[in-house]
Amino acid sequence: MGCLGNSKTEDQRNEEKAQREANKKIEKQLQKDKQVYRATHRLLLLGAGESGKSTIVKQMRILHVNGFNGEGGEEDPQAARSNSDGEKATKVQDIKNNLKEAIETIVAAMSNLVPPVELANPENQFRVDYILSVMNVPDFDFPPEFYEHAKALWEDEGVRACYERSNEYQLIDCAQYFLDKIDVIKQADYVPSDQDLLRCRVLTSGIFETKFQVDKVNFHMFDVGGQRDERRKWIQCFNDVTAIIFVVASSSYNMVIREDNQTNRLQEALNLFKSIWNNRWLRTISVILFLNKQDLLAEKVLAGKSKIEDYFPEFARYTTPEDATPEPGEDPRVTRAKYFIRDEFLRISTASGDGRHYCYPHFTCAVDTENIRRVFNDCRDIIQRMHLRQYELL
């Protein structure tokens, strides 16, 4: 009688069998997901605001995803094309906004600088008045007169003189690039080039993940906001990353950060690097250091208007290391400047290095696709070794 009480119906047996099979499938999928996860190189992009992190991500899309044709995951060519068209339209608006912000910022700064800057041609004052009048207009529709006034002002020597003093106020890096292209951007059929899209500045808020594959190896790159109030979100990304790519705007030695208009940008980057290098949660994660904006650094050094020693007095005593390898045709002043900045970061990493993580510096220009291709190829072996060490396979 007891046996009869424990007997199972056919339906119950079938249900249990189905449950066991479902559990097996779930377990198998979990194992598969774990293998994929362990085989993926996760790279965390860190750095102070406007250092070029998002531009590095754009380069990965150009080099390893599908350019700017959608996000690179669509199997349907029509869907990819539709996504691409939508993205390009959004980017055209972003580029026009960059152009507007650039001319507004420069003409607004003219009267605020000490000493102030005058227009070379006083007859252009009505153009300045127009630009300032549309400064806060929501959903601005970019009428022809906007481009006419912006172009005339950009050709005014007084406006150019104010632009030359842009380290004294907050101006986006791409200002000159887009102001030089007003005649192209104003066209109704304007389609941005890859270089236009690389130069376009949009504030990164939150965390963005880009997935790509190089020689059948999966990479996930996380780009996070660089402004101070974004940094508290970073800690979510720290868990189990293969490496940190720390991006520095090398040309920012004579600029101050947007957040307080006081702290030197390069000093802010050094302080941030130090806090990351010494963070107890990151003591085993190595850092690939991208000393970025080498093109702008070279321009500043050769122009000779802003001397590094005025901001970092120790530069006056610095000599270029014997093992320095300048680019072909590089001016010795540029070589000395870029190695000084490199060594400021290496001083931090060597002062508190305990052999559990390392710093690998590279000189980069994020808007130069070939430069980023070469640098990333150089980094891949390092990343692979970090990954093997992470899972104790090395």
Swiss-Prot record:
**Quaternary structure, from the entry:** Heterotrimeric G proteins are composed of 3 units; alpha, beta and gamma. The alpha chain contains the guanine nucleotide binding site. Component of the TAS2R14-GNAS2 complex, consisting of TAS2R14, GNAS2, GNB1 and GNG2; within the complex interacts with TAS2R14; this complex plays a role in the perception of bitterness. Interacts with CRY1; the interaction may block GPCR-mediated regulation of cAMP concentrations. Interacts with ADCY5 and stimulates its adenylyl cyclase activity. Interacts with ADCY6 and stimulates its adenylyl cyclase activity. Interacts with ADCY2.
Segments for region (G2 motif): 196-204
Q: What class of enzyme is it?
A: hydrolase
Provide the reaction this enzyme catalyses.
Answer: GTP + H2O = GDP + phosphate + H(+)
**Lipid attachment of type S-palmitoyl cysteine occurs at which residues?**
C3
Binding of GTP, residues: 47-55, 197-204, 223-227, 292-295, 366
**Quick one: where's the N-palmitoyl glycine lipidation?**
G2
**Protein's gene:** GNAS
Q: Which UniProt keywords apply?
A: ADP-ribosylation, Cell membrane, Cushing syndrome, Disease variant, Dwarfism, GTP-binding, Hydrolase, Isopeptide bond, Lipoprotein, Magnesium, Membrane, Metal-binding, Nucleotide-binding, Obesity, Palmitate, Phosphoprotein, Proto-oncogene, Transducer, Ubl conjugation
Ranges for the region named G4 motif are 288-295
**Entry-annotated residues carrying ADP-ribosylarginine:** R201
Q: Name one Pfam family in it.
A: G-alpha
Instruction: Give the position(s) of the covalent cross-link described as Glycyl lysine isopeptide (Lys-Gly) (interchain with G-Cter in ubiquitin).
Output: K300
Where is the segment annotated G3 motif? 219-228
Q: Where is this region: G5 motif?
A: 364-369
Q: What is its main location?
A: membrane
* GO molecular function terms listed in the Swiss-Prot or TrEMBL record: adenylate cyclase activator activity; D1 dopamine receptor binding; G protein activity; G-protein beta/gamma-subunit complex binding; GTP binding; GTPase activity; metal ion binding
- Give the protein's biological function: Guanine nucleotide-binding proteins (G proteins) function as transducers in numerous signaling pathways controlled by G protein-coupled receptors (GPCRs). The alpha chain contains the guanine nucleotide binding site and alternates between an active, GTP-bound state and an inactive, GDP-bound state. Signaling by an activated GPCR promotes GDP release and GTP binding. The alpha subunit has a low GTPase activity that converts bound GTP to GDP, thereby terminating the signal. Both GDP release and GTP hydrolysis are modulated by numerous regulatory proteins.
Q: Name one GO biological process term.
A: cellular response to prostaglandin E stimulus
Q: What else is known?
A: This protein is produced by a bicistronic gene which also produces the ALEX protein from an overlapping reading frame. The GNAS locus is imprinted in a complex manner, giving rise to distinct paternally, maternally and biallelically expressed proteins. The XLas isoforms are paternally derived, the Gnas isoforms are biallelically derived and the Nesp55 isoforms are maternally derived.
Protein name, UniProt field: Guanine nucleotide-binding protein G(s) subunit alpha isoforms short
Q: What disease has this protein been linked to? A: Albright hereditary osteodystrophy: A disorder characterized by short stature, obesity, round facies, brachydactyly and subcutaneous calcification. It is often associated with pseudohypoparathyoidism, hypocalcemia and elevated PTH levels.
Q: Which SUPFAM superfamilies match?
A: P-loop containing nucleoside triphosphate hydrolases, Transducin (alpha subunit), insertion domain
What segments bear the compositional bias annotation Basic and acidic residues? 8-23
Membrane topology (UniProt): Lipid-anchor
Localisation:
Cell membrane
**Which residues belong to any copy of the G-alpha domain?**
39-394
